[in-house]
């Protein structure tokens, strides 16, 4: 007969034992690497096209200068990684679906940049409309991720809110580009 959790004096949040500092640091590093790998892969399709077709594209009047995108995305990717790590640390019952939602949004994030920047020269405006569909799906996926993260770690959920705000803003830029190019 197995003793009950209460009899073992284990934390009620699902953790059997806390992770060691070394394991926590390694997993945080892994989340950061994954996040910045997505950023780096997206950057490959951006580099040539920001100074190519996008330089002469009709951009939204509220579009920020190109130099601002790098620092904003760097902060957002770091926040995403820390949020995922905070959820992972909890070992809560819904950690697996929460991190699955995180992986889905990261995949959609990875898809958007090459579609928007990389496919435009080949597909024209159709690439921009496809990118808009991806970013709308991305906003939905991040919203689902926040809904999973929040109950596990309030801080993790809050860390993703600026990401959603930026994605909504970016979707308006994408929409403008699709309509006007």
Predicted segments with their positions:
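Membrane-interface loop-to-helix entry segments
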Residues: 63-78, 124-140
